[in-house]
């Protein structure tokens, strides 16, 4: 491995550690031969998921996403791109059969989301489920592919884990978005119509409804565990942080503004989270 590529991969690992720590711990449970791909893919997700949040102007964030959309095409055409995550992805794609479809679908979902007006909220929970599928489940599909795991059952479980994780993380992000524009862009209209979002009780009711959908996906994923190949189960360990976050939401009565949500790792002590993750990994669960 060249020094340049090693530097790019180290950058990916550090980005995941800095900005997605609970998933960083999940990736450490993967077999060594899968970690390179997994960290590169997760770093790509960080680049696209943070593009709008770190931009001083939404137009700059959108330009960044469009750049990544174009970069995926270039990577699959074996063109060199001067960006550490792109270089790591290029190496992964040259060594493994990773579908371009999943990467494109992920960044295109982010682009479509970035182009929404503040007042243009999703109409149904199903729309948010599709967004979670497109941005989170696709990441798990790509990781399975990079590990040479071809299993319909694993893909099916990954779909549900991704939806559970994606929905839970959208709920966690609600205070951030409310602080930026005073709105809750990830509470769909059909849910908002059943609750009064400008009251604490109403918002908690909406969060409970959406958290219940996320939990149902997690239960469906775990119901498939008996058919999922053993080598795929560690790829699905993001089900653990999803469960932890949903459980923390339950403990704070689904109040996303409760400061306990930001303590430790997803609201629990770091050592407890790591022990739970290790236990699930050792038992072949997710």
Provide a role label for each language-model segment.
Residues 147-150, 161:
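A contiguous catalytic/ligand-binding core that recognizes phosphate-bearing ligands
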Residues 1-91, 103-110, 132-141, 154-167, ...:
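Catalytic cores of Mg2+-dependent Asp-rich isoprenoid enzymes
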Residues 122, 145-148, 195-200:
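Short, flexible active-site loops
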């Amino acid at each position: 491995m060249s020094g340049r590529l090693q530097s790019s991969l180290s950058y990916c690992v550090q980005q995941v550690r800095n900005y997605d720590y609970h998933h960083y711990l999940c990736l450490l449970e993967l077999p060594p031969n899968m970690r390179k791909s997994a960290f590169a893919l997760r770093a790509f997700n960080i680049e696209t998921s943070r593009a709008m949040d770190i931009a001083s102007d939404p137009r700059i964030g959108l330009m960044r996403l469009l750049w990544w959309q174009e970069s995926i095409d270039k990577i699959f055409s074996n063109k060199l791109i001067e960006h550490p995550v792109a270089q790591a992805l290029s190496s992964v794609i040259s060594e493994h059969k990773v579908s371009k479809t999943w990467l494109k679908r992920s960044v295109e979902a982010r682009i479509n989301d970035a182009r929404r007006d503040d007042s243009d909220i999703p109409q149904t929970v199903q729309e948010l489920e599709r967004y979670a599928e497109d941005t989170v489940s696709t990441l798990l599909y790509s990781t399975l592919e990079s590990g040479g795991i071809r299993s319909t059952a694993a893909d099916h479980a990954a779909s549900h884990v991704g939806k559970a994780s994606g929905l839970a993380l959208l709920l966690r992000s609600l205070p951030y978005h409310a602080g930026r524009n005073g709105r809750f862009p990830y509470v769909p209209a059909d849910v908002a119509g059943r609750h009064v979002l400008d009251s604490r009780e109403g918002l908690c009711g909406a969060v409970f409804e959406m958290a219940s959908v996320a939990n149902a996906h997690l239960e469906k994923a775990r119901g498939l565990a008996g058919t999922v190949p053993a080598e795929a189960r560690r790829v699905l360990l993001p089900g653990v942080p999803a469960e932890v976050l949903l459980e923390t939401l339950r403990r704070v009565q689904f109040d996303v503004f409760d400061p306990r949500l930001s303590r430790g790792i997803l609201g629990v002590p770091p050592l407890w989270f790591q022990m739970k993750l290790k236990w699930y990994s050792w038992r072949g669960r997710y």
